[in-house]
């Protein structure tokens, strides 16, 4: 059970404190006009947000370790640059109509966008710093009709009156086709070799059967809440059971063996017992990150930096893997 504490009235009412089912607490702070200024997680670490006083757009985010990201906008509230905690900057330029015309990635790569229609926001071409050019054509409804890559290879696309893609035609004459029912659900795909895969649905729109080109059928059955309870593939059937919270608690394989799952009050997986009887356990910190897992005689610890980024893991005290 969660308990929410609010402040403010009417449109300025905000959740400022949340007591979670495990007893942990997270908090949020807002300014006088209801804009988020800070969030404190269950471990007591605070992330600060600095909104522009006029537009409300976020101009700066400072994480608990003091690292900051900055965001800059033009007078149309479009993002023009962003600088990450590492100091690398992303930049964007726009034309008089507010359309993106150039984007510079943090690594310095530049992409330019060209437009041939003053009334369209869809580019007709993109060009990178090496001069490689890709072109696109669009329908008046914004559907992609053709794409030409930097080598001149052309791919064309067909759509139905509802905007759904019905065919892809490649330059060498190979085509792929798609068909839909009256509800817009995909019911058939024919590949470039002419092989067709068909799809069937129940009244709720859930995919129930996939019929392969060779006629083999894979099926799925659902409960009244739309959760898959049984799947059949290649003549082999597997079933799933759920608890009252909708979490998978038991899987039964085609040979009748079982895998069971247990969760904590925050819906985090804490134990998995396989069909062979082997049990794996998982432990999380206050913010929900996996910090320890146990698999028979193996104990794995997961380590993070102050920005919650995974840095390394150890197995039985020995470093097994590192990330940078």
Task: Annotate each predicted stretch with a short phrase.
Residues 1-20, 24-41, 45-63, 67-84, ...:
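Beta-strand elements of repeat-based all-beta scaffolds
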């Amino acid at each position: 059970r969660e308990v929410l504490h609010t402040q403010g009235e009417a449109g300025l009412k905000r959740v400022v404190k949340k007591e979670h089912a495990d007893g942990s607490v997270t908090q949020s702070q807002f300014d006088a006009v209801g804009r988020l200024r800070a969030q404190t997680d269950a471990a007591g670490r605070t992330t600060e947000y600095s909104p522009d006083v006029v537009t409300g757009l976020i101009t700066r985010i400072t994480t608990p370790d003091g690292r900051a990201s900055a965001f800059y906008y033009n007078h149309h509230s479009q993002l023009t640059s962003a600088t990450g905690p590492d100091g690398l900057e992303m930049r964007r330029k726009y034309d008089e109509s507010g359309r993106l015309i150039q984007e510079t990635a943090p690594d310095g790569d530049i992409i330019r966008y060209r437009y041939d229609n003053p009334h369209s926001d869809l580019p007709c071409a993109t060009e990178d710093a090496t001069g490689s050019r890709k072109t696109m054509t669009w329908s008046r409804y914004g559907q992609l009709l053709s794409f030409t890559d930097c080598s001149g290879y052309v791919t064309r696309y067909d759509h139905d009156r509802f905007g759904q893609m019905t065919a892809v035609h490649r330059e060498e004459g190979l085509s792929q086709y798609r068909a839909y029912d009256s509800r817009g659900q995909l019911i058939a795909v024919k590949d470039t070799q002419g092989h067709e895969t068909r799809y069937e649905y129940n009244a709720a729109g859930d995919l129930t059967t996939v019929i392969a080109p060779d006629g083999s059928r894979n099926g799925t059955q659902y409960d009244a809440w739309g959760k898959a309870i049984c799947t059949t593939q290649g003549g082999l059937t597997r079933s799933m059971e759920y608890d009252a919270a909708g979490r998978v608690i038991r899987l039964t394989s085609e040979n009748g063996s079982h895998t069971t799952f247990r969760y904590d009050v925050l819906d985090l997986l804490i134990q998995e017992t396989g069909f062979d009887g082997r049990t794996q356990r998982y432990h999380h910190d206050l913010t929900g990150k996996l910090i320890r897992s146990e698999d028979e005689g193996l104990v794995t610890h997961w380590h993070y930096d102050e920005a919650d980024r995974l840095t390394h893991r150890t197995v039985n005290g020995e470093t097994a893997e590192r990330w940078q």
